[in-house]
Amino acid sequence: DLGAKLALNLRAGDCISLIGDLGAGKTTLSRGLIQALMGADTEVPSPTYTIVQTYETDPAPIWHFDLYRIESPNELIELGFEDAEDDIMVIEWPENAGSLLPSQRLIVELIFTDNGRSARLTGTTPEWKQRLNDIFDRS
């Protein structure tokens, strides 16, 4: 499970941006990631209407954002978006964050294919690229 693999390698200050069409699996991936750290019984609702849900995990709290309904990045300031940067951020619809989106992040693009779905992972820093190599070399 991709979410679980990523979860076990997260650190405070990490940002994961999830890109994909409606129904591509962004919330499902987020749920798998959070449940890998908190237990399979943990309820992980989509934050579509609340915009953000937080979870106390080790190594750091996770802020799960769904920015689908955000009309302006300024709305994020009121929600504590910048406060989350020292913790772990998982962001659905990251394009709606504008310039507030951290530049150092892991981009996970979920794509519909003839056989279901696939994921393209891109690290924006050398550290993320190395971590991805480590994660998938062990798999």
Map each language-model feature to its residues.
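Phosphate-binding P-loop
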Residues: 7-13
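Conserved lysine of the Walker
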Residues: 26
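Hydrophobic anchor at the beta1->P-loop junction of P-loop NTPases
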Residues: 16-18
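The conserved Walker
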Residues: 22
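Short phosphate-coordinating micro-motif centered on Lys-Gly-acidic
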Residues: 72, 79-139
